């Protein structure tokens, strides 16, 4: 139907000049992004269910709703049939058997920003150039929590990552060959539960008005503010500002020596 095959262009290497416009990732916002399509598809499926139930109950669609797994009449709340009964009818009715499904596509037009902060308490042994993290609290406004337990676990994971890249995790390379020198868990100092104090996560639930379910991002944000909070706590304790991470004993020794806290 095109008339000329040269009108067809196969794109093998994509860049921003030819791909559709994107509004950005803005951290891990899967619930935010997928929520629009989930809600839209759910409403479409509900519409199809009520359409089919209208045939079985001889009720008007606008006079029915789905409540607690049942089709109910909105005027008096009477249960007309359960969803399981409707599913059996839809599947095995010899006269009108059908699969009730719904599909939809939703293009995201909005973005939502998450807000959060971290409070850290440290103990610094200046002669030993050692930092001990005594306490850390991570607070986030991630919109309405869909799964509080999973949200808390997500924050704990981000805090652990922040402690790691803030104090110990550093990938070393051979300057001549570019070969990684510590590409294993023995030499790469990944923080573990033995390096952590109690990890406390708190939430401020401000529902996002542009979101289908009031949610916002909670993927990367917990890992962002932890290391800067530890750095600022070290500065508050010693008066020494450090502009790199991880803040290892070697870095502390160099900076403490430069500031006169350690003398040869």
Model-derived regions, located:
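C-terminal catalytic domains of large/alpha subunits in multi-subunit enzymes
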Residues: 1-264
